[in-house]
Amino acid sequence: MRTWACLLLLGCGYLAHVLAEEPGIPRDVLDRLARSQIHSIRDLQRLLEIDSVGAEDAPEPSLRAPGVHTARHVAEKPPAPVPVRRKRTIEEAIPAICKTRTVIYEIPRSQVDPTSANFLIWPPCVEVKRCTGCCNTSSVKCQPSRVHHRSVKVAKVEYVRKKPKLKEVQVRLEEHLECACAASSAGPEHREEEAGRRRESGKKRKRKRLRPT
């Protein structure tokens, strides 16, 4: 098991978060780790081109009881049997790969009514698909590569003159369809928001006409 522990330590060294903090690791190795799919220690072994992994057996506990010095003493009082420890099988860690998973999304109050605070939302949270998981190196992050937006109806409950008033409000939800390990940057949803802002600002700005002198 010591050899497996050494292999895990070696793998953790290769999976360091940035090259600047690991000057002894070649950049091409980090790039290869970032692009590769690693599902097990065997995959890591093949990727790092490690030919074989040995196994060392733990030393067996001594069956001789402490305090036994002579055969005569053993004959008079036999030692109690010492239980033999059995090696436990330790399972291999399963990586949480970058993919879509169902997560709980709490509906922001600003999406229902940004001008008021005295109301309730039902349901207060829903299930959506989002990209979660980890990548082989921290230089890349699990990000959505394709998104989808859908609208749902929620109930807005407020009290007017001590009487409950219910109103249905549409809320826009974002679903992640595909994920990828990529460098940290603005995702497709951010690019869409920025494009919308540019369009709005373009409408507000008008070119000034120069009067002839």
From Swiss-Prot:
Signal peptide (residue range): 1-20
Induction line: The form A3 is selectively induced by angiotensin II.
InterPro entries found in the cross-reference section: Cystine-knot_cytokine, PD_growth_factor_CS, PDGF/VEGF_dom, PDGF_N
Biased composition (Basic residues): 200-213
Region (Disordered): 181-213
Compartment(s) where it occurs, according to its Swiss-Prot or TrEMBL record: Secreted
Chief place where the protein resides: secreted
Region called Receptor binding site, residue ranges: 158-162
MF-aspect GO terms: collagen binding; growth factor activity; platelet-derived growth factor receptor binding; protein homodimerization activity
Family as reported in the entry's similarity comment: Belongs to the PDGF/VEGF growth factor family.
UniProt-listed PANTHER family: PLATELET-DERIVED GROWTH FACTOR, PLATELET-DERIVED GROWTH FACTOR SUBUNIT A
Subunit structure: Homodimer; antiparallel disulfide-linked dimer. Heterodimer with PDGFB; antiparallel disulfide-linked dimer. The PDGFA homodimer interacts with PDGFRA homodimers, and with heterodimers formed by PDGFRA and PDGFRB. The heterodimer composed of PDGFA and PDGFB interacts with PDGFRA homodimers, and with heterodimers formed by PDGFRA and PDGFRB. Interacts with CSPG4.
Name of the protein: Platelet-derived growth factor subunit A
Higher taxonomy: Eukaryota, Metazoa, Chordata, Craniata, Vertebrata
